[in-house]
Structure formats: structure tokens, C-alpha cells
């Protein structure tokens, strides 16, 4: 999604055909590099949706109905690209769900452009990391089957909700957000389905040298497990940084992401017992 978002924005910029109020749409658990890319191009971004393309489609519907979604303004034609972490892409407002056909066409155009420039798609992705910072994303599955598993999962989420950790893997928890908090940004529940979807916890952590991380935890909507989405990111590469130093920073971020996921799962499972 980072590749296609940047590619489409760069092409529209080069062609002088950017819409009047361009907007990128994504979820809370999708890579944060999208936010940096959108801000680089000066476009609006919705980056805090729940998981599921019905939420992306709702943004388009709100723009269509009222011309606004929260602080974002525009029309459906202003959509640049909507995405989620499972590689779903929506790039046309008329198709309000995952659209693999358009995603393949965009990727093919990107690959052709890279080939003409003597580069590969991997080169393009590495360039994004250098320009916007390296992001390491991972997923931890906490499988809990049967009635007992469902009860354990509820205990785990309620335990973390009541007693959020102060630090994870040596990184201080800078903020904690419970999307079931009706005094928070999502407001009162709209119904039972909304309440279930908002069983979602967000832990943001701060590391050294501009490195930051995030863990999001939610029950799966289709399988007997909880999902912990882990992200650790660093700053853009300074022009004076050597290749060795850059490689070392990437390895450091990879290691921090692995440790963050491992320790978070251990602390979460302690509440499930």
C-alpha cells in the first residue's frame, strides 16, 4: 500500500492532475509510513479507521453525503487510495471494497516505470524507507479456542484495559487508548456491533533516537484468536549517514519490533490465565 500510494501521488503530481482536495484513507493498524507520505505531498489523510473496508467506504459515503469526514473535506472523486494492512486496496470511489484488479494494474504500471528507470520495485521501496523512515510491521496471533478461550480473551483485554503496562521491551508507553472509552474520540456506541468492533486497545511507545512504536490489540472478527499488530519506525535517513550506519539502524528497529511483540504477548497472556 505504501508503494502504490506514493506512486499514484507522484504520478498525479507530475501530470498536474491532483484532485482539488486529495485524501488518502487507511486504518489504525496499517503502516504509519502512509501518513508521512501523505503529508509530504500535502494531502489529507484518514489514518485511524477500524479494520474492514466498510469503514473505508463509510468515509467515501460521508464525503458524498456531507462533503466532510471529521476534519477532512472533499468529494468521493478526491480519493487517492484507501488501504489496509492485509494488502487490500481501494483506488476508485465507485468500488467501495477491496479491488484487486485496480491494485494489480497500479502495481504493473509501477513495475514498468521502475524497469524503464533501470530500477526494481524493491529499489523503489528501499527509496521510500530512506526518504520517510524505515518501518517494521508484524503480527502476533494469540490463539484461544473454545468457550474457555473466549473467556480468557475477554479477561486478557479487560486486564490490559484496567492495568495498561508502563513500559514494553524497555520502551516507555507514551500513550494508551481504549476505543471502547465513550468519552474518547469515537464517542458513544452506535450499537452492539459498534461496541464489539471497538474492543480495540492501542499502546504507543517511545524509543531512543527518534524511534517509536505501537501495538494494537483486538479480537479477530473471523477466527478464535486475538491479533496484536506491532510497528516500530525510525526517522528518515540523513544524507550524511553511511550505508553501514543505516543498515545498523534497520537491524536495531527489526530487533526492537521482535522484542516488542514478544514481550507484549507475554504480558497480555498473563491476564488470560
Segments (PLM) and residue ranges:
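Phosphate-binding and adjacent anionic-ligand microenvironments
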Residues: 11-218, 225-229, 235-241, 246-273
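Catalytic or ion-translocation cores adjacent to nucleophile or general acid/base/metal-coordination motifs
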Residues: 1-11
Amino acid at each position: 500500500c505504501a508503494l502504490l500510494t506514493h506512486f499514484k501521488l507522484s504520478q498525479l503530481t507530475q501530470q498536474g492532475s491532483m484532485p482539488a482536495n486529495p485524501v488518502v484513507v487507511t486504518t489504525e493498524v496499517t503502516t504509519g509510513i502512509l501518513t508521512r507520505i501523505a503529508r509530504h505531498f500535502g494531502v489529507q489523510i484518514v489514518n485511524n479507521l477500524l479494520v474492514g473496508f466498510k469503514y473505508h467506504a463509510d468515509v467515501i459515503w460521508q464525503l458524498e453525503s456531507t462533503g466532510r469526514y471529521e476534519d477532512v473535506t472533499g468529494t468521493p472523486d478526491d480519493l487517492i487510495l484507501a488501504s489496509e494492512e492485509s494488502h487490500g486496496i481501494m483506488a476508485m470511489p465507485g468500488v467501495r471494497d477491496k479491488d484487486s484488479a485496480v491494485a494489480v494494474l497500479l502495481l504493473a504500471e509501477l513495475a514498468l516505470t521502475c524497469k524503464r528507470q533501470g530500477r526494481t520495485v524493491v529499489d523503489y521501496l528501499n527509496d521510500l524507507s530512506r526518504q520517510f523512515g524505515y518501518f517494521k510491521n508484524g503480527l502476533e496471533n494469540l490463539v484461544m479456542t473454545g468457550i474457555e478461550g473466549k473467556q480468557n480473551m475477554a479477561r486478557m483485554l479487560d486486564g490490559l484495559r484496567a492495568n495498561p503496562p508502563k513500559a514494553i521491551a524497555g520502551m516507555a508507553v507514551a500513550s494508551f487508548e481504549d476505543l471502547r472509552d465513550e468519552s474518547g474520540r469515537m464517542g458513544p456506541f452506535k450499537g452492539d456491533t459498534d461496541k464489539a468492533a471497538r474492543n480495540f486497545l492501542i499502546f504507543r511507545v517511545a524509543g531512543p533516537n527518534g524511534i517509536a512504536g505501537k501495538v494494537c490489540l483486538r479480537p479477530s472478527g473471523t477466527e478464535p484468536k486475538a491479533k496484536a499488530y506491532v510497528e516500530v519506525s525510525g526517522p528518515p535517513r540523513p544524507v550524511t549517514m553511511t550505508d553501514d550506519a543505516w543498515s545498523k539502524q534497520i537491524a536495531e528497529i527489526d530487533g526492537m519490533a521482535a522484542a516488542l511483540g514478544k514481550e507484549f504477548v507475554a504480558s497480555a497472556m498473563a491476564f488470560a490465565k
